[in-house]
């Protein structure tokens, strides 16, 4: 998993609340169990005018040329609600997004994102609105998300602080998923196992 320390990137926004996981990655695309290849289906029902995904919707934000290559997504409250599917952060990450900034997230989506290297940043509704206004008013507007300082820097230079559980921050800073986190304690695990009495093995 790629470590997340500080990232500066083009920002794009979907100014909607309660974006659920079926909107993020519709159920018909969930048959794969590997993490790659989901980006093309991200927001499928909004991005395309046809079921096959051959006709882009020119009015959808992510299809606008000015947002091509965006790596930071701004959204409204309760992002990632709905059914539990790890494919949602897989699709967002495979599309090229590194961070999602919103006033709130659904709990399961929030945890799944952290476990898959996607940083969910909670800011106040007013702070998210300011970021959206700045991004809308300036083509090519970039936002910096610094996990080392837990700050978001807007295109105009305004700084907003956010919080993240230290365990989650440690995993993201070091690029550790659940398996990687376990392996990072390999020495301690080995010492523990070496001291287990033979009759308990």
From Swiss-Prot:
It comes from the Bacteria. GO terms for cellular component: 3-isopropylmalate dehydratase complex. GO terms for biological process: L-leucine biosynthetic process. It is an enzyme of class 4 (lyase). The keyword Transit peptide does not apply. Its EC number is 4.2.1.33. The keyword Metal-binding does not apply. Keywords: Amino-acid biosynthesis, Branched-chain amino acid biosynthesis, Leucine biosynthesis, Lyase. Signal peptide: none annotated. Pfam families: Aconitase_C (PF00694). It catalyses: (2R,3S)-3-isopropylmalate = (2S)-2-isopropylmalate. Heterodimer of LeuC and LeuD. Belongs to the LeuD family. LeuD type 1 subfamily. PANTHER family: 3-ISOPROPYLMALATE DEHYDRATASE SMALL SUBUNIT (PTHR43345:SF5), 3-ISOPROPYLMALATE DEHYDRATASE SMALL SUBUNIT 2-RELATED-RELATED (PTHR43345). This is 3-isopropylmalate dehydratase small subunit. It comes from Shewanella sp. (strain MR-4).
């Amino acid at each position: 998993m790629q470590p997340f320390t500080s990232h500066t990137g083009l920002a794009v926004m979907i100014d909607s609340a309660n974006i659920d996981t079926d909107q993020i990655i519709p159920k018909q695309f969930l048959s794969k169990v590997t993490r790659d290849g989901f980006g093309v289906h991200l927001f499928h029902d909004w991005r395309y005018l046809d079921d096959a995904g051959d006709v882009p919707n020119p009015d959808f934000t992510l299809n606008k040329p000015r947002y091509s290559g965006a790596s930071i997504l701004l959204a409204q409250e309760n992002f990632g609600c709905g059914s539990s599917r790890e494919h949602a952060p897989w699709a967002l990450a495979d599309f090229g997004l590194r961070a999602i900034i919103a006033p709130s997230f659904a709990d399961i989506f929030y945890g799944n994102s952290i476990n898959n290297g996607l940083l969910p940043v909670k800011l106040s509704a007013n702070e998210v609105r300011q970021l959206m206004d700045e991004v809308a008013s300036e083509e090519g507007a970039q936002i910096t998300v610094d996990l080392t300082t837990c700050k978001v820097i807007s295109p105009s230079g305004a700084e907003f602080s956010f919080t993240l559980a230290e365990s989650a921050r440690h995993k993201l800073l070091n690029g550790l998923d659940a398996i990687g986190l376990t392996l990072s304690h390999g020495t301690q695990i080995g010492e523990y196992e070496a001291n287990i009495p033979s009759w308990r093995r």
